[in-house]
């Protein structure tokens, strides 16, 4: 099964997450199919905290990829911010 989930990056105490499409059996930070965005939970000032390629998200959801609960929350948050 293909899932859309967060892959952690950054350094200790400075998390940064890539929003990736990956096979469910692959480890969290392992091989992925496509990177469709990022989430920076500690963005300050003018820094961008969330970016998701909506066209790619729509494509992957259309072919059956399952978003994680956190990614679902971030998508809703991004849609509310864009509206």
Curated annotation (Swiss-Prot):
SUPFAM superfamilies to which the protein is assigned, alphabetical: Ribosomal protein S16 (SSF54565)
Cystine crosslinks: none
Keyword Coiled coil: no
Keyword Ribosomal protein: yes
Homology family: Belongs to the bacterial ribosomal protein bS16 family.
Keyword tags: Ribonucleoprotein, Ribosomal protein
An example molecular function term from Gene Ontology annotations: structural constituent of ribosome
Source lineage: Bacteria, Pseudomonadati, Pseudomonadota, Betaproteobacteria, Burkholderiales
Cited Gene3D superfamilies: 3.30.1320.10
Gene: rpsP
GO cellular component: cytoplasm; small ribosomal subunit
InterPro entries noted in UniProt: Ribosomal_bS16 (IPR000307), Ribosomal_bS16_dom_sf (IPR023803)
Protein's name in the database: Small ribosomal subunit protein bS16
PANTHER family: 30S RIBOSOMAL PROTEIN S16 (PTHR12919), SMALL RIBOSOMAL SUBUNIT PROTEIN BS16M (PTHR12919:SF20)
Any one GO biological process: translation
Domain of life: Bacteria
């Amino acid at each position: 099964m293909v899932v859309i989930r967060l892959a952690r990056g950054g350094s200790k105490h400075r998390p940064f997450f890539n929003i990736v499409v990956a096979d469910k059996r692959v480890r969290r930070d392992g091989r992925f199919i496509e990177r469709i965005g990022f989430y920076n939970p500690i963005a300050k000032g003018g820094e961008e905290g969330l970016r998701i390629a909506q066209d790619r998200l729509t494509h992957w959801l259309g072919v059956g990829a399952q978003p994680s609960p956190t990614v679902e929350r971030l998508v809703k948050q991004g849609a509310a911010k864009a509206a």
